[in-house]
Regions:
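Extracellular glycan-recognition regions
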Residues: 1-132
Length: 132
């Protein structure tokens, strides 16, 4: 995906009791195990945006944002993430939004992850052309 492009990722998910994270990785670099991610953390009733690796001590390059989010196990949820250059916005169930910027890594690689048990469905990726 060229840097100037805008893209959107949508997916639905349900999770089982005890699941700690359902997330989407953005601009991840497998060679150095670094990137960004939006992570839904049902046990903590929040959605977070993190840059990884997470440094054990404070660092000016550390990024951490969060919003409260109350979901229930075994209920259908929808996630939409829109990325334009360095800007990313995550919408959950059209009720919670979390926006950020991503400056340090720009690999344009994405991924989905689950820590626990969850079902992901209706996974869609759309790249927007200029003027769309």
């Amino acid at each position: 995906i060229p840097k100037e492009d805008v893209y959107r990722i949508d997916f639905d998910f349900t999770y089982e009791e005890g699941t700690s994270r359902v997330g989407i990785l953005l601009n991840n670099d497998l060679k150095i195990d670094a990137g960004y991610g939006y992570f839904i953390e049902p046990l903590h009733h929040r959605v977070v945006f993190e840059q990884f690796p997470i440094f054990p001590q404070y660092s000016f390059v550390s990024v951490y944002l969060e919003r409260p989010l109350h979901l229930k196990p075994n209920e259908l949820n929808h996630v939409c993430v829109i990325v334009q250059d360095t800007v990313a916005v995550c919408y959950i169930n059209d009720t919670v939004a979390l926006s950020t910027r991503m400056y340090n890594y720009n690999t344009q690689k994405i991924g989905l992850l689950v820590q626990g048990k969850a079902s992901l469905s209706n996974i869609k990726f759309k790249r927007f052309e200029k003027g769309e």
